[in-house]
């Protein structure tokens, strides 16, 4: 039920006939460039994360100022 070497060769020939070798070469180079760009981006991201110092945690605003800004409301239910 699996694919044999003959099946894969026939499939490859059909793909080459449909798309042509130039188009397949362009697709391959575009895909390779995308993978290379992704790998470079991952390297830059990890380098920046290692170089950046850990930020000190900021204190949360006091509850007194939060209480002044809070609006107290009551929910009404439908009868």
Swiss-Prot record:
Source organism, top-level taxon: Bacteria
Molecular function in Gene Ontology: protein transmembrane transporter activity
A GO cellular component entry from the record: TAT protein transport complex
Subcellular locations according to the entry: Cell inner membrane
Region annotated Disordered, chain positions: 43-63
GO BP: any one term: protein transport by the Tat complex
Gene3D superfamilies: 1.20.5.3310
Protein's membrane topology: Single-pass membrane protein
The keyword Plastid is annotated on this UniProt entry: no
Membrane spanning residue stretches: 1-21
Keywords carried by this UniProt record: Cell inner membrane, Cell membrane, Membrane, Protein transport, Translocation, Transmembrane, Transmembrane helix, Transport
Name of one Pfam family that matches: TatA_B_E
HAMAP family named among the record's database cross-references: TatA_E
Family, similarity comment: Belongs to the TatA/E family.
NCBIfam families given in the database record: PRK02958.1 (NF002813), tatAE (TIGR01411)
Subunit structure: The Tat system comprises two distinct complexes: a TatABC complex, containing multiple copies of TatA, TatB and TatC subunits, and a separate TatA complex, containing only TatA subunits. Substrates initially bind to the TatABC complex, which probably triggers association of the separate TatA complex to form the active translocon.
Protein name: Sec-independent protein translocase protein TatA
Organism of provenance: Albidiferax ferrireducens (strain ATCC BAA-621 / DSM 15236 / T118) (Rhodoferax ferrireducens)
Lineage: Bacteria, Pseudomonadati, Pseudomonadota, Betaproteobacteria, Burkholderiales
């Amino acid at each position: 039920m699996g694919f044999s070497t003959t099946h894969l060769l026939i499939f490859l020939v059909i793909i080459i006939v449909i798309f042509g070798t130039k188009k397949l070469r362009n697709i391959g180079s575009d895909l390779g460039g995308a993978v290379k760009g992704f790998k470079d981006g991952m390297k830059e991201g990890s380098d920046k994360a290692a170089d950046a110092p850990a930020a000190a945690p900021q204190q949360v605003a006091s509850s007194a100022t939060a209480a002044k800004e809070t609006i107290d409301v009551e929910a009404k239910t439908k009868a």
